[in-house]
A protein has these predicted regions:
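Solvent-exposed soluble domains appended to multi-pass membrane proteins
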Residues: 1-214
């Protein structure tokens, strides 16, 4: 990742090996530790305009964080789960790590937003379809990855509710959101503002009306 990141003209690359922390796993450090180091960096560069890509890993196996100690209300959640979902320890632990990842990111956003109110956040995931307890759902719910643009000047009606896109459109969309009149940029795909056609991955395609499989057996 480091070699690729620096080849894309980023000025710096930091990984778990640069931080001091306890716990974590082969994927990296716990999310809350990662975010604290990013907070520190942003605070030190408060007068600079900086662009950060942050890769979190705590909602990834082996799920070895003590999420109950972090505040995950396991017993309360267990009582509220529908019959269609399992309530075994493995499932609850997996849910707890999703909760932990969400809490860590939410706390980070609140802190940075308070210190730098003009910050624009983009939140997305690299894939879906990996959570064992969420298979009894429709294809869209199971497969679609959300992408959230959040900031004080981001209008909730900026994009249509049924808008679809792909990760390759994030940078071009950001360029149009933060750029000045007359700015130009190069991109493989147009922004989410300019394209309303079909998007696809290795097994699915979708438009604003439907999602279908590319594989017919």
């Amino acid at each position: 990742i480091k070699q690729f990141t620096l080849s894309q003209n980023f000025d710096e690359f930091h990984c778990a090996g640069d931080f001091q922390y306890e716990g974590g796993n082969s994927w990296g450090c716990p999310d809350e530790i990662l975010f604290k180091y990013v907070e520190k960096y942003i605070a030190e560069e408060k007068d600079e305009r900086t662009f950060h890509i942050i890769l979190t890993t705590s909602n990834h196996p082996p799920y070895n964080i003590d999420v109950v100690a972090k505040g995950f209300p396991k017993e309360e959640i267990k009582q509220k789960l529908p019959d269609s979902l399992g309530s075994d320890e493995e499932t609850l632990n997996e849910m707890g790590h999703i909760w932990y990842a969400d809490q860590s990111m939410g706390n980070f956003i609140e802190k940075v937003e308070a210190d730098k109110p003009d910050t624009l956040f983009v939140i997305t995931g690299d894939h879906a379809e990996r959570f064992d307890f969420s298979k009894e759902v429709d294809l869209k719910t199971l497969s679609v990855v959300p992408c959230i643009f959040y900031g004080k000047n981001v209008d909730k009606d900026l994009l249509a509710d049924n808008k679809v896109g792909c990760h390759l459109q994030i940078i071009s969309t950001l360029a149009e959101m933060v750029g000045q009149k007359g700015d130009t940029y190069s991109s493989i795909w147009p922004s989410l503002f300019d394209y309303n056609g079909i998007v696809f991955n290795h097994r699915l395609w979708t438009d604003t009306e439907k999602i279908l499989s590319l594989i017919h057996i």
